[in-house]
Amino acid sequence: MRNGKILCCHCFYNKGDHEDDEGGRSIESLCAVNLAEGLNPRTNGPGKDSFSFSTSGSKPSSSLSFPVTSSMVSSTSSYSSFLFLLVVNHLFSGRLRCGSPEFIIRSFTITLGPLNHNISPFVFFHGNISSLPDLLVWLCRSVRCKTSTFLVIEIGKTNEEAASIIILPKLPLDACDVKSSIIVGIL
């Protein structure tokens, strides 16, 4: 959610500026449908891979997990490319605050227990890093993850302003490879 509007990450239109799909369902309802259908995005049309996030305050008003399939993480290179494409998408669509050319990317791991391979959530969040504990608790509850280990990648300015944060499952690969791929892509 940005300035009170639901965004679609497939077409980047605001709700209200976007035509309903052929079934007459709005972007907001499509987001709910995607979540209810087990996060199985539509193959085309509005609402594909939809999510919402907050750009104000220290806590997200809402976030939506995104599925990471086993085919996406079959190798380090494909996983890094997947992350890079997501970051580039948000750079070009204005999701990241690019007021300064100096960006930092910090990665660290938060462990809440053994990794649950049944569910692989992905969350893109724009906000303050201090809200991460609450966000992770919300994430575990929303995707019915009993215990998980998360890799958190923060992309933002060197000051205390809100940063864009990527949260994904900790996988058996070198986090430095993921970081390097994203940094090269942004530069």
From Swiss-Prot:
Region of interest called Disordered, as start-end residue ranges on this chain: 42-63
Source taxonomy: Eukaryota, Fungi, Dikarya, Ascomycota, Saccharomycotina
Biased composition (Low complexity): 50-63
Misc remark: Present with 1730 molecules/cell in log phase SD medium.
Protein known as: Uncharacterized protein YLR358C
